[in-house]
Every structure is written in C-alpha cells, then in structure tokens.
C-alpha cells in the first residue's frame, strides 16, 4: 500500500480536488494494516495529501471492488486453463492478473464508485439497486470517465445525515 497505492494516488489525484480528504477503504482481513499504522501515517504525511485509512463495514459486498467483478473475471479466465495442481492455479491467477486489461478494471472501479454514491444517497442503507451506466457503450464512444465524482448535494446530504454538517465549512 505504501509503495504502490500512495504514489499512484498522489500522481493521479485531480488538482481541482486538492485539499479534499481521500479515504482508502480496506476489508477487515488480517493481512491489512490498521488505520493508525505508524509507517502508513508517515508515508501519508510525505504525500502532502489528506489520506485516511478506514475499514469496510461488515456485510457490505457492494463496497468490495473485488466482489463487483474482478474475481469473477479472473475466475472465468483461469477456468480456461484447467489447472491440475494448486501451483498451476496460482500461476494462472498471477499470469491473468498481470495481463488483466486496465479498461476492465476501470469498469469495476466505476461500479464501486457508483455504489458508494448510492449508499450515500440512501443514508448508508443498502436498499438500492446497483447502478448500471452502460460502461461498455460509453467506452466505445470514448466517453467513459476515468472516475466518478460524488455530486455536492449528495455529499452535503450525507454529512447532514451524519449530523456533522455544522462542523464542515462548505
């Protein structure tokens, strides 16, 4: 995370969003680091960005980009290999992930971002339909955005729902 993710965020973060808090959400698996990990905190300070590490809420698969399509896509690619041993399967997954096309991963990340907006729109509840944006068609037209932004009114409403609107300067 420190060697790859933070530099990637720093290099690609839009200038017009400077000063905005960036939240990195990870699931609760044991290999992940804690939000107050000292090495992570120092590395974030070096970026000059406001980056915070948070844990994925329990039972929220829509917030797991891997569950939104990446694993299924890798599985369908590796199923074609018919591995006979565990080592063959691991090698196949590693090969496929290294050769995984960026545009496919972008589609997964856009779905994740759209789910995040919907969760904010529904005051944190999960009673929404996963939005479909015709990503393939937009991609073919050269109109697929590299990222989604949260509409200001959705963000403000989410802050209001959390009862912290008064503490945030707009």
Where are these regions (language model features)?
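RNase H-like polynucleotidyl transferase catalytic core
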Residues: 25-28, 43-65
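Alpha-helical hydrophobic/aromatic positions enriched in membrane-embedded helices and signal peptides
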Residues: 19-20, 56, 116
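Distinct, well-ordered alpha-helical segments
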Residues: 37-38
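Mobile genetic element proteins and their domesticated derivatives, centered on retroelements
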Residues: 1, 24-27, 41, 64, ...
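C-terminal anion-handling pockets and recognition modules
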Residues: 66-170
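C-terminal catalytic core of Y-nucleophile DNA break-rejoin enzymes
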Residues: 29-34
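Short, basic/hydrophobic alpha-helical segments
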Residues: 1-23
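A structural preference for long, well-packed, hydrophobic secondary-structure segments
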Residues: 9-13, 54-60, 73-80
């Amino acid at each position: 995370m420190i060697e790859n993710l933070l530099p990637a965020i720093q290099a690609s973060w839009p200038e017009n969003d400077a000063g905005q808090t960036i939240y990195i959400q990870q699931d609760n698996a044991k290999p992940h680091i804690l939000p107050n990990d000292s090495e992570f905190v120092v590395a974030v300070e070096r970026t000059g960005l406001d980056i915070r590490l948070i844990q994925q809420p329990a039972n929220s698969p829509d917030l797991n980009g891997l569950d939104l399509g990446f694993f299924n896509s890798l599985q369908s690619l590796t199923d074609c290999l018919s591995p006979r041993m565990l080592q063959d399967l691991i090698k196949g997954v590693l090969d496929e992930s290294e050769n995984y096309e960026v545009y496919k991963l972008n589609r997964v990340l856009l779905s994740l971002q759209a789910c995040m907006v919907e969760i904010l729109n529904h005051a944190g509840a999960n009673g929404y339909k996963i939005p479909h944006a015709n990503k393939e068609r937009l991609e073919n037209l050269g109109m697929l955005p590299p990222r989604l932004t949260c509409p200001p009114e959705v963000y403000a409403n989410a802050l209001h729902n959390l009862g912290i609107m008064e503490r945030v300067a707009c």
